[in-house]
Amino acid sequence: MPFSTIATPEAKPVANYKIATRMEGGRLLYISGQVAWDAAGNIVGKGDVRAQARQVFENLRGVLRAAGGDLANLMKITTYITRLEDFPAVAQARGEVFQGELPASTLIVVKSLFHPDFLLEIEGVASV
Protein backbone atom coordinates (compact mmCIF):
# COMPACT_ATOMS: atom_id res chain seq x y z
CA MET A 1 0.00 0.00 0.00
CA PRO A 2 1.23 3.50 -0.70
CA PHE A 3 1.90 5.83 2.18
CA SER A 4 2.16 9.58 2.55
CA THR A 5 4.92 11.52 4.24
CA ILE A 6 4.22 14.30 6.72
CA ALA A 7 6.76 17.11 6.83
CA THR A 8 6.87 20.33 8.82
CA PRO A 9 9.41 23.16 9.10
CA GLU A 10 9.23 22.92 12.91
CA ALA A 11 10.78 19.45 12.90
CA LYS A 12 13.04 19.17 9.89
CA PRO A 13 14.77 15.88 9.18
CA VAL A 14 18.54 16.16 9.32
CA ALA A 15 19.26 12.99 7.42
CA ASN A 16 17.60 10.75 4.87
CA TYR A 17 14.54 9.68 6.86
CA LYS A 18 10.89 10.63 7.19
CA ILE A 19 9.51 12.64 10.09
CA ALA A 20 6.17 10.81 9.92
CA THR A 21 4.29 8.45 7.64
CA ARG A 22 0.69 7.41 7.19
CA MET A 23 -0.85 4.75 4.98
CA GLU A 24 -3.00 6.32 2.27
CA GLY A 25 -6.60 6.32 3.43
CA GLY A 26 -5.61 5.44 6.98
CA ARG A 27 -5.72 7.40 10.20
CA LEU A 28 -2.67 6.01 11.99
CA LEU A 29 0.35 8.29 11.89
CA TYR A 30 3.78 6.93 12.83
CA ILE A 31 6.08 9.71 14.05
CA SER A 32 9.83 9.20 14.04
CA GLY A 33 11.79 10.01 17.18
CA GLN A 34 11.89 13.74 17.84
CA VAL A 35 14.81 15.43 19.56
CA ALA A 36 15.39 18.95 20.87
CA TRP A 37 16.17 20.66 17.59
CA ASP A 38 14.54 23.92 16.68
CA ALA A 39 13.43 24.82 13.14
CA ALA A 40 16.91 26.20 12.36
CA GLY A 41 18.60 22.94 13.37
CA ASN A 42 19.99 24.25 16.67
CA ILE A 43 20.01 22.08 19.77
CA VAL A 44 17.67 23.55 22.39
CA GLY A 45 18.47 23.24 26.10
CA LYS A 46 21.95 21.73 26.13
CA GLY A 47 22.28 20.06 29.54
CA ASP A 48 18.66 20.91 30.50
CA VAL A 49 16.39 17.90 30.05
CA ARG A 50 13.21 19.83 30.89
CA ALA A 51 13.93 22.44 28.19
CA GLN A 52 14.73 19.65 25.76
CA ALA A 53 11.50 17.84 26.63
CA ARG A 54 9.48 21.00 25.97
CA GLN A 55 11.14 21.38 22.56
CA VAL A 56 10.53 17.72 21.73
CA PHE A 57 6.83 18.09 22.55
CA GLU A 58 6.67 21.23 20.40
CA ASN A 59 8.24 19.27 17.54
CA LEU A 60 5.69 16.50 18.02
CA ARG A 61 2.91 19.10 18.04
CA GLY A 62 4.25 20.56 14.77
CA VAL A 63 4.25 17.16 13.08
CA LEU A 64 0.74 16.44 14.31
CA ARG A 65 -0.55 19.83 13.15
CA ALA A 66 0.94 19.23 9.71
CA ALA A 67 -1.07 16.00 9.64
CA GLY A 68 -4.26 17.75 10.75
CA GLY A 69 -4.13 16.90 14.45
CA ASP A 70 -2.61 17.90 17.78
CA LEU A 71 -1.06 16.28 20.84
CA ALA A 72 -4.50 14.99 21.88
CA ASN A 73 -4.32 12.65 18.87
CA LEU A 74 -1.29 10.80 20.25
CA MET A 75 -2.22 7.26 21.24
CA LYS A 76 1.25 6.00 22.24
CA ILE A 77 4.65 7.52 22.89
CA THR A 78 8.00 5.91 23.52
CA THR A 79 10.49 8.06 25.39
CA TYR A 80 14.20 7.34 25.32
CA ILE A 81 16.28 9.05 28.02
CA THR A 82 19.98 8.82 28.72
CA ARG A 83 19.72 9.25 32.52
CA LEU A 84 16.99 7.70 34.66
CA GLU A 85 17.29 10.56 37.15
CA ASP A 86 15.95 12.91 34.43
CA PHE A 87 12.59 11.16 34.34
CA PRO A 88 10.82 13.46 36.87
CA ALA A 89 11.69 16.54 34.77
CA VAL A 90 10.51 14.82 31.58
CA ALA A 91 7.27 13.77 33.30
CA GLN A 92 6.74 17.35 34.48
CA ALA A 93 7.19 18.72 30.96
CA ARG A 94 4.83 16.05 29.64
CA GLY A 95 2.23 17.11 32.20
CA GLU A 96 2.52 20.72 31.03
CA VAL A 97 1.65 19.93 27.41
CA PHE A 98 -1.05 17.27 27.68
CA GLN A 99 -4.57 18.34 28.55
CA GLY A 100 -6.85 15.51 29.66
CA GLU A 101 -5.97 11.94 28.81
CA LEU A 102 -2.33 10.95 28.50
CA PRO A 103 -1.27 8.59 25.72
CA ALA A 104 -0.01 5.11 26.51
CA SER A 105 3.67 5.49 27.28
CA THR A 106 6.88 3.50 27.45
CA LEU A 107 10.13 4.77 28.97
CA ILE A 108 13.46 3.31 27.91
CA VAL A 109 16.83 4.29 29.36
CA VAL A 110 19.59 4.17 26.75
CA LYS A 111 23.34 4.61 26.92
CA SER A 112 23.32 7.44 24.40
CA LEU A 113 21.44 8.98 21.50
CA PHE A 114 22.90 9.86 18.11
CA HIS A 115 24.34 13.19 19.36
CA PRO A 116 25.88 13.52 22.84
CA ASP A 117 23.97 16.75 23.62
CA PHE A 118 20.56 15.08 23.25
CA LEU A 119 19.18 13.85 26.56
CA LEU A 120 15.91 12.41 25.28
CA GLU A 121 14.04 11.38 22.16
CA ILE A 122 10.31 10.69 21.80
CA GLU A 123 8.51 8.83 19.03
CA GLY A 124 4.78 8.40 18.72
CA VAL A 125 1.76 6.84 17.12
CA ALA A 126 -1.31 9.01 16.58
CA SER A 127 -4.77 8.67 15.11
CA VAL A 128 -5.44 11.69 12.90
Language-model region placement:
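N-terminal presequence-like segments and the immediate start of the first folded domain
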Residues: 1-58, 62-75, 81-128
